Amino acid sequence: SPEVMKSLSENFCKAMDQCKQELNLPDEVIKDLYN
């Protein structure tokens, strides 16, 4: 269902933000992952 996908992507974004902060990744690295 769309709601499941929405919560999954929200959780994924939260996890990515935490990883970014812990590893001090620049946003460019994140953009590379998405492309």
UniProtKB/Swiss-Prot annotation:
Transmembrane segments: none annotated. The lineage of its organism: Eukaryota, Metazoa, Ecdysozoa, Arthropoda, Hexapoda. One of its GO terms (molecular function) is pheromone binding. This is Pheromone-binding protein. InterPro entries: PBP_GOBP_sf (IPR036728). GO terms for biological process: response to pheromone. Antenna. Belongs to the PBP/GOBP family. Keywords: Pheromone response, Pheromone-binding, Transport. This major soluble protein in olfactory sensilla of male moths might serve to solubilize the extremely hydrophobic pheromone molecules and to transport pheromone through the aqueous lymph to receptors located on olfactory cilia.
